[in-house]
Protein backbone atom coordinates (compact mmCIF):
# COMPACT_ATOMS: atom_id res chain seq x y z
CA UNK A 1 0.00 0.00 0.00
CA UNK A 2 1.45 3.35 -1.07
CA UNK A 3 1.87 6.02 1.57
CA UNK A 4 -0.97 8.53 1.44
CA UNK A 5 -3.43 6.10 -0.14
CA UNK A 6 -6.98 6.73 1.03
CA UNK A 7 -8.42 3.51 2.42
CA UNK A 8 -11.88 2.36 1.44
CA UNK A 9 -14.18 0.92 4.07
CA UNK A 10 -16.01 -2.37 4.42
CA UNK A 11 -18.68 -2.13 7.11
CA UNK A 12 -19.48 -5.52 8.65
CA UNK A 13 -22.88 -5.61 10.36
CA UNK A 14 -23.54 -8.81 12.32
CA UNK A 15 -27.01 -9.63 13.61
CA UNK A 16 -26.80 -12.76 15.74
CA UNK A 17 -26.47 -13.16 19.51
CA UNK A 18 -24.47 -16.37 19.11
CA UNK A 19 -20.67 -16.34 19.23
CA UNK A 20 -19.07 -16.58 15.82
CA UNK A 21 -18.07 -20.25 16.15
CA UNK A 22 -21.72 -21.20 16.75
CA UNK A 23 -23.24 -18.98 14.07
CA UNK A 24 -23.30 -20.14 10.46
CA UNK A 25 -23.95 -16.65 9.06
CA UNK A 26 -21.14 -15.04 11.08
CA UNK A 27 -18.69 -17.85 10.28
CA UNK A 28 -19.34 -17.53 6.55
CA UNK A 29 -19.18 -13.73 6.77
CA UNK A 30 -15.76 -13.85 8.43
CA UNK A 31 -14.40 -16.15 5.72
CA UNK A 32 -15.88 -13.92 3.03
CA UNK A 33 -14.36 -10.78 4.56
CA UNK A 34 -10.93 -12.38 4.97
CA UNK A 35 -10.93 -13.45 1.30
CA UNK A 36 -12.15 -10.02 0.24
CA UNK A 37 -9.33 -8.29 2.12
CA UNK A 38 -6.74 -10.57 0.55
CA UNK A 39 -7.84 -9.37 -2.88
CA UNK A 40 -8.59 -5.76 -1.96
CA UNK A 41 -5.63 -4.31 -0.08
CA UNK A 42 -7.07 -0.80 -0.18
CA UNK A 43 -9.92 -1.71 2.19
CA UNK A 44 -10.15 -1.58 5.96
CA UNK A 45 -12.90 -3.21 8.02
CA UNK A 46 -15.16 -1.59 10.56
CA UNK A 47 -17.47 -3.89 12.53
CA UNK A 48 -20.72 -3.36 14.37
CA UNK A 49 -22.49 -6.13 16.28
CA UNK A 50 -26.14 -5.14 16.59
CA UNK A 51 -26.57 -7.41 19.62
CA UNK A 52 -23.70 -5.76 21.50
CA UNK A 53 -23.86 -2.16 20.31
CA UNK A 54 -26.58 0.20 21.47
CA UNK A 55 -29.16 0.82 18.73
CA UNK A 56 -31.64 3.53 19.76
CA UNK A 57 -35.36 2.96 19.52
CA UNK A 58 -36.74 5.96 17.71
CA UNK A 59 -38.96 8.36 19.66
CA UNK A 60 -41.02 11.26 18.29
CA UNK A 61 -38.97 13.91 20.12
CA UNK A 62 -35.86 12.95 18.14
CA UNK A 63 -37.36 14.29 14.89
CA UNK A 64 -38.09 17.73 13.50
CA UNK A 65 -39.97 16.20 10.55
CA UNK A 66 -40.42 12.84 8.87
CA UNK A 67 -37.13 10.92 8.70
CA UNK A 68 -35.19 14.00 9.81
CA UNK A 69 -33.40 14.09 13.17
CA UNK A 70 -33.63 17.37 15.10
CA UNK A 71 -30.89 19.89 14.43
CA UNK A 72 -28.10 20.45 16.95
CA UNK A 73 -29.68 23.53 18.53
CA UNK A 74 -33.01 21.78 19.12
CA UNK A 75 -31.23 18.66 20.32
CA UNK A 76 -29.71 20.72 23.16
CA UNK A 77 -33.23 21.33 24.47
CA UNK A 78 -33.75 17.60 25.02
CA UNK A 79 -32.86 15.88 28.28
CA UNK A 80 -29.42 14.25 28.58
CA UNK A 81 -30.65 10.77 27.71
CA UNK A 82 -32.43 11.93 24.56
CA UNK A 83 -29.44 14.03 23.49
CA UNK A 84 -27.22 10.96 23.69
CA UNK A 85 -29.73 8.95 21.67
CA UNK A 86 -29.82 11.59 18.93
CA UNK A 87 -26.01 11.69 18.85
CA UNK A 88 -25.93 7.91 18.56
CA UNK A 89 -28.42 7.92 15.68
CA UNK A 90 -26.31 10.51 13.85
CA UNK A 91 -23.14 8.48 14.44
CA UNK A 92 -24.70 5.26 13.13
CA UNK A 93 -25.95 7.02 10.01
CA UNK A 94 -22.60 8.73 9.34
CA UNK A 95 -20.76 5.44 9.82
CA UNK A 96 -23.02 3.77 7.27
CA UNK A 97 -22.64 6.57 4.73
CA UNK A 98 -18.83 6.45 4.99
CA UNK A 99 -18.58 2.84 3.78
CA UNK A 100 -18.06 1.53 0.25
CA UNK A 101 -18.95 -2.11 0.83
CA UNK A 102 -21.41 -3.51 3.34
CA UNK A 103 -21.66 -7.06 4.66
CA UNK A 104 -24.70 -8.03 6.72
CA UNK A 105 -24.69 -11.44 8.41
CA UNK A 106 -28.05 -12.53 9.80
CA UNK A 107 -30.12 -15.68 10.30
CA UNK A 108 -33.58 -16.05 8.83
CA UNK A 109 -36.06 -15.59 11.65
CA UNK A 110 -39.82 -15.85 11.09
CA UNK A 111 -39.30 -15.46 7.30
CA UNK A 112 -37.36 -12.26 8.03
CA UNK A 113 -34.39 -11.30 10.25
CA UNK A 114 -33.78 -10.43 13.93
CA UNK A 115 -35.43 -7.21 15.16
CA UNK A 116 -32.18 -5.26 15.87
CA UNK A 117 -31.54 -5.04 12.12
CA UNK A 118 -34.85 -3.24 11.51
CA UNK A 119 -34.11 -0.82 14.36
CA UNK A 120 -30.69 -0.16 12.82
CA UNK A 121 -32.20 0.50 9.38
CA UNK A 122 -34.66 2.94 10.95
CA UNK A 123 -31.69 4.86 12.39
CA UNK A 124 -29.87 5.19 9.07
CA UNK A 125 -32.91 6.08 6.95
CA UNK A 126 -32.47 9.85 7.28
CA UNK A 127 -33.62 12.76 5.13
CA UNK A 128 -30.67 14.65 3.60
CA UNK A 129 -28.35 11.83 4.66
CA UNK A 130 -29.33 8.62 2.86
CA UNK A 131 -32.50 9.86 1.14
CA UNK A 132 -34.08 13.21 0.34
CA UNK A 133 -37.64 14.35 -0.17
CA UNK A 134 -38.27 16.19 -3.44
CA UNK A 135 -41.89 17.28 -3.33
CA UNK A 136 -43.87 14.06 -3.27
CA UNK A 137 -40.90 12.00 -4.44
CA UNK A 138 -38.13 10.39 -2.42
CA UNK A 139 -34.68 10.39 -4.03
CA UNK A 140 -31.71 8.18 -3.04
CA UNK A 141 -28.47 9.79 -1.86
CA UNK A 142 -26.20 6.74 -1.63
CA UNK A 143 -25.73 6.63 -5.40
CA UNK A 144 -22.93 9.18 -5.04
CA UNK A 145 -20.18 6.56 -5.36
CA UNK A 146 -19.90 2.83 -6.15
CA UNK A 147 -21.35 0.87 -3.23
CA UNK A 148 -22.03 -2.83 -2.79
CA UNK A 149 -24.21 -4.68 -0.28
CA UNK A 150 -23.54 -8.35 0.48
CA UNK A 151 -26.30 -10.03 2.49
CA UNK A 152 -25.28 -13.32 4.12
CA UNK A 153 -28.25 -15.24 5.48
CA UNK A 154 -28.35 -18.59 7.25
CA UNK A 155 -31.48 -20.70 7.49
CA UNK A 156 -32.19 -24.02 9.15
CA UNK A 157 -33.84 -25.58 6.11
CA UNK A 158 -33.62 -25.28 2.36
CA UNK A 159 -35.82 -22.60 0.83
CA UNK A 160 -36.95 -23.76 -2.63
CA UNK A 161 -36.04 -21.29 -5.35
CA UNK A 162 -39.62 -20.86 -6.52
CA UNK A 163 -40.80 -20.06 -2.97
CA UNK A 164 -38.12 -17.49 -2.18
CA UNK A 165 -40.27 -14.47 -3.15
CA UNK A 166 -42.85 -15.68 -0.62
CA UNK A 167 -40.69 -17.15 2.14
CA UNK A 168 -37.56 -15.01 1.96
CA UNK A 169 -39.17 -11.74 2.95
CA UNK A 170 -36.15 -10.54 4.93
CA UNK A 171 -33.80 -10.89 1.97
CA UNK A 172 -36.28 -9.18 -0.35
CA UNK A 173 -36.75 -6.30 2.09
CA UNK A 174 -33.01 -5.71 2.55
CA UNK A 175 -32.45 -5.67 -1.21
CA UNK A 176 -35.35 -3.25 -1.74
CA UNK A 177 -34.40 -0.86 1.06
CA UNK A 178 -30.73 -0.72 0.03
CA UNK A 179 -31.65 0.08 -3.57
CA UNK A 180 -34.15 2.62 -2.24
CA UNK A 181 -31.21 4.44 -0.61
CA UNK A 182 -29.15 4.19 -3.80
CA UNK A 183 -26.98 1.10 -3.23
CA UNK A 184 -27.42 -0.46 -6.64
CA UNK A 185 -25.18 -3.52 -6.39
CA UNK A 186 -26.69 -6.21 -4.17
CA UNK A 187 -25.26 -9.69 -3.69
CA UNK A 188 -26.79 -12.50 -1.66
CA UNK A 189 -25.00 -15.42 -0.05
CA UNK A 190 -27.51 -17.92 1.30
CA UNK A 191 -26.38 -20.57 3.78
CA UNK A 192 -29.19 -23.13 3.84
CA UNK A 193 -29.65 -26.42 5.71
CA UNK A 194 -27.74 -25.36 8.82
CA UNK A 195 -30.17 -27.27 11.06
CA UNK A 196 -33.32 -26.00 12.70
CA UNK A 197 -31.49 -24.64 15.76
CA UNK A 198 -29.51 -22.20 13.61
Model-derived segments and spans:
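Flexible, glycine-rich phosphate/dinucleotide-binding loops
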Residues: 19, 54, 158, 195-197
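Cofactor-binding loop segments of dinucleotide-utilizing enzymes, especially the Rossmann-like FAD-
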Residues: 15, 154, 191
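Glycine-rich phosphate/pyrophosphate-binding loop and the adjoining helix
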Residues: 34-37, 160-198
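N-terminal beta1-alpha1-beta2 submodule of the flavodoxin-like/Rossmannoid cofactor-binding fold
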Residues: 2-106, 111-115, 119
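Helix-loop-strand module that forms the ligand-binding subsite of alpha/beta enzymes
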Residues: 82-166, 171
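Residues at the starts of beta-strands that form the adenosine-phosphate
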Residues: 9, 44, 147-148, 185
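Short glycine/proline-enriched loop/turn "hinge" motifs that connect secondary-structure elements
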Residues: 2-4, 140-145, 180-182
